[in-house]
């Protein structure tokens, strides 16, 4: 195998496939990058950790077709360190040489025969959209994905199509995020799939510079195709909880507040709130205000008064301040808060109604 390629092109390709490489595996082959130089001027890079598989195709000056498996992390570090010029790669059965200007590296290689086959997914359903739309929606729901691996279903993002409407949902059982995407799904049968949250975030980031992304669904796999990249992920098995029954259909108290001012006040007051100390919100209709306060025993307390449009009466309620900030970070200039009572979940959304809704459980105060 022998080919020449621009450093920038190779570095970008390696950065794309690195996410599919196993960082801690008892199988050395999974820590490598399969490099396949094809006749016709194409070089294909592949990685897999057996849960996800990534393939990236790039143009190159292929002198001799062939395959090899290079040590992924070391190969990446070498390419990053080389000057911005053409890189030559030549591989035999036992070693490979990487050359650029006056610099030369020799690396041990693994047998490409031992590298797992790339999964060819026959998708039953395919949906196409702009990567920017997907990235925006994934970014809004990602913060509510659970990190508790013992509850695998909550570590994923629910991707659902219902009556032609596309929606992403996530929850860690303390808060719930729902994002509707303005994507036409007419002709697509209703379905749902749970995609690992970290994988979904990786795809949204990797596809950001592409014009289009297609998402295909098979029995137990999802395939994302964007530009010259194919990303295959497993689905998370299991039944996602019925989140709709958690969404209130009415509220007692409605509030409108300027998002930036609210966030700033929460951050200031939270300096006196420990991790498990609730942030106290007191909404007063007559004063059209909210008092944000917190107190920690043997430390002290803080409070801040803000203007707020309050309808429906007064209410005092406590929330985890970090969960509040996570929700507010996805909202527009003005936030709408809907409350049913001091011990019932609250709803936050943008006054602009951008299709995003954030439900948060209160903390007893």
Per-range role (PLM):
Residues 1-365:
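Structural preference for solvent-exposed beta-strand-turn elements
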């Amino acid at each position: 195998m022998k080919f020449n390629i621009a450093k920038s092109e190779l570095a970008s390709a390696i950065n794309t496939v690195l996410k599919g490489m196993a960082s801690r595996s008892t199988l050395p082959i999974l820590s490598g990058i399969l490099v396949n130089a094809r006749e016709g001027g194409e070089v294909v890079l592949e990685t897999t950790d057996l849960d996800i598989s990534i393939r990236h195709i790039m143009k190159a000056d292929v002198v001799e077709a062939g395959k090899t498996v290079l040590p992924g992390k070391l190969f990446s570090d070498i390419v990053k360190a080389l000057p911005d010029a053409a890189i030559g790669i030549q591989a035999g059965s036992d070693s490979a040489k990487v050359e650029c200007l006056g610099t030369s590296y020799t690396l041990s290689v693994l047998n490409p025969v031992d590298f797992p086959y790339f999964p060819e997914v026959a998708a039953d359903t395919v949906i196409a959209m702009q990567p920017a739309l997907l990235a925006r929606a994934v970014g809004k729901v990602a913060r509510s994905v659970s990190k508790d691996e013992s509850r695998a279903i909550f570590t994923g993002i629910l991707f659902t199509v219902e009556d032609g409407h596309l929606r992403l949902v996530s929850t860690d059982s303390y808060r719930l995020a729902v994002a509707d995407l303005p994507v036409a799904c007419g002709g697509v049968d209703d379905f749902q799939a749970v995609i690992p949250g970290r994988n979904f975030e990786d795809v949204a980031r990797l596809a950001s510079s592409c014009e289009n992304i297609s998402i295909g669904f098979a029995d137990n796999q999802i395939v994302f195709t964007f530009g010259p990249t194919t990303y295959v992920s497993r689905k998370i098995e299991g039944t996602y909880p019925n989140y709709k029954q958690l969404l209130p259909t009415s509220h007692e108290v409605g509030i409108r507040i300027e998002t930036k001012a609210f966030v700033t006040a929460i951050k200031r007051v939270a300096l006196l709130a420990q991790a498990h100390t609730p942030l106290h919100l007191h909404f007063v209709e007559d004063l059209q205000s909210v008092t944000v306060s917190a107190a920690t025993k043997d430390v002290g307390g803080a409070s801040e008064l803000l203007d707020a449009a309050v309808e429906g009466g007064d209410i005092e309620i406590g929330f985890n301040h970090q969960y509040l900030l996570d929700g507010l970070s996805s909202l527009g200039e003005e936030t709408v808060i809907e409350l049913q009572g001091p011990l019932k979940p609250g709803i936050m959304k943008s006054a602009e109604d951008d299709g995003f809704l954030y439900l948060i459980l209160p903390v007893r105060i």
